[in-house]
Amino acid sequence: EEVQQAQEQKHGFTTPNWCYSLYENALRARAGRSYKDHLLHIGKIYERYSENAAKAPEVSWFPNKMSAEEIAVPNFTPGNRAITNVYTRQCCAFNEVDMAAAALVTSVGMAKKLGIPEDKWVYVHGTASTEDTSLMSSRAAYHQSIQHHVGFKKVLEMARKTVDDISFFDIYSPYPCMPQLAAEALNLPVDDRRGWNLVGGHSFHGAPGAGFGCLMVVAMAQKCRENRGQFGLVNTNGGRITTQGYGIYSTEPFPQSVWQAPIPGSYAYEVNTVKRPIFNPVPSGNCVIEVFTVCFGHEFA
């Protein structure tokens, strides 16, 4: 494993912009799209993200609504250069910003004791978490996320809901491949009318690294308060699509007698036992390229 890690570091497999681009290229190839068509495809996905960021200019890093071309076509907008062959600067995460959020998680009894008004209460109906290998070259596939297939299934099972019962989604989206991977796992169109975010994602709202997960939970709590009795699903992400968290929320109380979060270790095998490629430190012979990306510096973009 140390040799494999060293090889990945040598070839840039630890750089998020490059790693997420591998998934994006795989999704493009899977769909059979040309590069031009795929750039417009991801631009249209992120149009809705920019719309949500524009609705909250007081907290968004880029609060201006942008078109698909402005977002995803290199240099359509001055300064929006190509980072890789599928991502422009505006498609990438902006995760070094000064932001914070806080959520108070407690029991009904303690909430009453603290005098928190009941119209502020939001209940957790389901939780789940999954983890994949951190080794990019050992991922089972790049056009889908086995973690999502397991995680979404488990969180919906705990909440006793189906995907049709969910009114709002907020999918952790540092790059456009993330809502597409979620759509694939949930068997939904990527342009689902409910959308995949509430506040604009990493690229438009901006986020303090993985701390964006807390911002998402706070935004979902507010959304649930405004739409009482409806359900929202939040997905968080860490590393390079390495760790995933899932939560379902609503102002509707969950029967306390049956609330029991499954232990992640009880279903980890569903991710861990999937067939994976075997690393060969001394390769020889013919090969098939599974996925690739092209990375640009300032002078070539």
Regions found by a protein language model. Give the residues of each.
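Conserved "HGTGT" condensation-loop signature of ketosynthase/thiolase-family condensing enzymes
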Residues: 1-103, 107-110, 116-207, 222, ...
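Conserved beta-strand elements of the Class I
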Residues: 167-168, 231-233
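Phosphate/diphosphate-binding loops
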Residues: 209-231
